[in-house]
Regions:
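Serine-dependent protease modules
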Residues: 17-284, 288-291, 296-300, 326, ...
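Sec-dependent signal peptide recognition
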Residues: 2-7
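Short hydrophobic alpha-helical segments used for membrane anchoring or interfacial signaling
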Residues: 92-93, 346-349
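A structural signal for beta-strand boundary/capping segments at domain termini and interdomain linkers
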Residues: 121, 352-354
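Conserved PDZ fold ligand-binding element
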Residues: 96-103, 303-326
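C-terminal motif of bacterial Sec signal peptides marking the signal peptidase cleavage site
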Residues: 13-14
Length: 371
């Protein structure tokens, strides 16, 4: 049975209830004939992006039991402090030194060290984290940085080629290639801990080889644009077996912008519980195709309720974007801030309607939440 694991390398060195699920020149991909076989050549893309990916090392101290053998007996001698290191990757997103990585790469870190592709080693400051998307923002002070330009994950298509760049097994600046296998995957891998905002999972799935240490690395397209932050793999043993997942850059950029400005993500919520549609449900509603997500519950006095949405409505679009799964709805709503006016399209009693929703934060207001 496959399990989902975060791709992090570790070593020992010494409305809170609402919104849940029930025009530049392109770097062309060319082909190189080799004994009758044609291979895609991504060397230009790799050269343009590899300097934008960094190696991250974190250090944390843990208290562990100390045992000692005494005349054949194991005696508990209390506890001892040991340093543990974890390794991952990060993506430079600005000339000012901001770096996107995964929350699980830097979680509980007491020290964070970044190694650039040119071998410079610099300390990093943690600007903020967003456990709901498993993202974190770091900042370093260094000259001559080469950030990877942002792409558009919305326009990414299943089947298009991509590169994954990271540091698997501490093998720095490793590039692997594949295609986008699927979009809007909700894998249930971000743990919903008490007091945390609802997880947002709408991953890009790829078959590019990803292994421990790739966490926080880049997923780039054939135009040398960043379209995702590598996060996890699906594997029975924790190593690559053909399935890996990345956070869409359109979502990641909003998280980075908010952490940079506020220290906390300003995330909008509708205040609904939804159920994904099935063919039988669509037939019962008189629909010829399976589409939208069904509002199983509308939280009283929250955003959707105030806009007139009701239990049993079929939500079809958010901000003009079709939402046919819980993941798609969460991603689209999560890109907006509390107070944003968002147009939604829904189906009720055989007719399609539209309304405008004023999104709220997880506390049911439109106020800015700061760290």
């Amino acid at each position: 049975m496959k399990k989902l694991v975060f791709v992090l390398t570790m070593a020992l060195i010494g409305c809170q209830s609402g919104q849940t699920q029930q025009n530049e020149e392109m770097n062309r991909v060319v082909t190189m004939p080799t004994q009758g076989v044609r291979y895609a050549d991504f060397s230009d893309v790799a050269a343009l992006t590899i300097d934008g990916v960094v190696h991250i090392r974190t250090v944390q101290t843990r208290l562990t039991p100390l045992y000692q053998s005494f005349f054949g007996f194991i005696i508990n001698q209390g506890v001892q402090r040991k340093e543990y290191s974890a390794y991952g990757s990060g993506v430079i997103i600005s000339d000012e030194g901001y770096i996107l990585t995964n929350n699980h790469v830097v979680q509980h870190a007491e020290q964070i060290q970044v190694t650039l592709n040119d071998k410079r080693v610099v300390p990093a400051q943690l600007i903020g984290t967003d456990p709901a998307t498993d993202l974190a923002l770091l900042k370093i002070e260094a000259d001559g940085l080469k950030p990877i330009p942002m792409g558009n994950s919305d326009s990414a298509r299943v089947g298009q080629p991509v590169l994954a760049i990271g540091n698997p097994f501490n093998l720095t600046s490793t590039v692997t290639a594949g295609i986008i296998s699927a979009k809007a995957r909700n894998m249930g891998i971000i743990e919903n801990t008490r007091g945390m905002e609802s997880p947002i999972e709408s991953f890009i799935q790829t078959d590019a080889a990803v292994n421990p240490g790739n966490s926080g690395g880049a997923l780039v397209d054939a135009n040398a644009r960043l379209i995702g932050i590598v996060t996890a793999i699906a594997s029975a043993d924790g190593y690559y077996t053909g399935y890996s997942f990345a956070i869409p850059v359109n979502l990641a950029q909003k998280v980075a912008d908010d952490l940079r400005r506020y220290g906390h993500v300003q995330r909008g919520y509708l205040g609904v519980n939804v159920v994904e549609m099935s063919s039988s449900m669509a037939a019962q509603m008189g629909l010829k195709e399976v589409k939208g997500v069904l509002l199983a519950r509308v939280v009283p006095d929250c955003a959707a309720d105030r806009a007139g949405l009701k239990q049993g409505d079929l939500l079809l679009k958010v901000a003009g974007v079709e939402v046919n799964s819980f993941a798609e709805m969460m991603e689209e709503v999560g890109r907006h801030a509390p107070g944003d006016l968002v147009d939604v399209t829904y189906y009720r009693n055989g007719k399609t309607h539209s309304t405008t929703v004023t999104l709220q934060n997880s506390q049911g207001t439109t106020a800015v939440i700061r760290r």
